[in-house]
């Protein structure tokens, strides 16, 4: 064999070894449980909720929340961890099915109860949905936020009605104002995007009424005026009102009242004439 052919053979052998090593490394990375590659280029920012949607290996989109020591990955529909407890979409669905079966057998809710352990499982599940609707709000998927907040409010009602122990009836109630606020914000945001500003204001009004009802129920009406959830909704309502088209007659009426208050009677007379002319013209 010539020296040239020998060198060529050795070079080809080295190339083959290198390709084999690279392929082995690729396979190792693809099967590795190390999440370093998933986090690369996605730094954790303290004080900021970092969320993204990614394509899952199963072909379905996933929701990821960046944490200081890694990430939280959730399904976008169904139970956030992708599990189906007792073959149901969620534990809440499972226990609601149990209730329906109990009613079918006995014709009443009487004697249907949730044990302390069952309530604990429902609370843990509620946290998963909280983490998801918070993430969904960040990426402005407001319809899904309404879905998940409605669901957690339903869970609070369910535990409140059927928990066997008083503490299990009440432990989630402290979160009702926050969930109600997020539900109203998401619903109003959808309506604003559709140009339905009056509907958005009505959604906020209903949310505020529900929060007020919560505090009244526990004899804490003064706390309602100071609660952060109500302040957030009132600020949102103000922003929406600024987007409403201005009624020129209503604006002139406001100017008239201001002129009368300042005793600017000549200005008030002019404003009355303008109002009268516009109303007659209408």
Could you describe each region identified by the protein language model?
Residues 2-7, 23-159, 205:
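N-terminal alpha-helical interaction modules that lie
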Residues 145, 152, 159, 206-210, ...:
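Alpha-helical solenoid scaffolds that mediate protein-protein interactions
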Residues 112-126, 168-180, 238-248:
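TPR-adjacent "capping" and linker segments in tetratricopeptide-repeat scaffold/adaptor proteins
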Residues 129-130, 148, 177, 184, ...:
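TPR repeat positional signature
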Residues 104-107, 177-193, 224-248:
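Alpha-helical linker/edge segments of TPR/alpha-solenoid repeat scaffolds
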Residues 132-136, 140, 181, 186-189, ...:
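Conserved small-residue packing positions in alpha-helical repeats and bundles
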């Amino acid at each position: 064999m010539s020296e040239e052919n020998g060198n060529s053979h050795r070079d080809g052998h080295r190339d083959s070894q290198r390709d084999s090593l690279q392929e082995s490394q690729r396979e190792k990375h693809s099967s590795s449980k190390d999440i370093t590659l998933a986090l690369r280029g996605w730094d954790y920012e303290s004080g900021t909720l970092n969320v993204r949607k990614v394509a899952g290996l199963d072909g379905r989109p996933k929701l990821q929340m960046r944490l200081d020591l890694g990430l939280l990955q959730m399904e976008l529909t169904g139970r956030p961890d992708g599990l189906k407890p007792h073959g149901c979409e969620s534990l809440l669905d499972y226990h609601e099915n149990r209730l329906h079966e109990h009613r079918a057998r006995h014709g009443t809710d009487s004697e249907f109860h949730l044990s302390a352990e069952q309530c604990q499982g429902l609370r843990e599940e509620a946290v998963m949905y909280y983490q998801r609707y918070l993430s969904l709000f960040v990426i402005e998927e407001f319809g899904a936020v309404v879905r998940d907040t409605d669901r957690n409010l339903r869970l609070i009602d369910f535990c409140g009605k059927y928990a066997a122990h008083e503490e299990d009836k009440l432990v989630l109630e402290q979160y009702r104002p926050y969930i109600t606020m997020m539900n109203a914000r998401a619903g109003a945001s959808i309506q604003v995007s559709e140009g339905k500003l009056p509907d958005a204001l009505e959604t906020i009004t209903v949310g505020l009424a529900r929060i007020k009802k919560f505090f009244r129920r526990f004899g804490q009406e003064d706390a309602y005026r100071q609660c952060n959830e109500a302040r957030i909704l009132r600020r949102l309502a103000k922003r929406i009102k600024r987007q409403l088209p201005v009624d020129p007659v209503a604006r002139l009426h406001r100017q008239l009242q201001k002129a009368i208050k300042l005793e600017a009677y000549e200005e008030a007379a002019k404003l009355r004439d303008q109002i009268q002319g516009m109303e007659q013209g209408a």
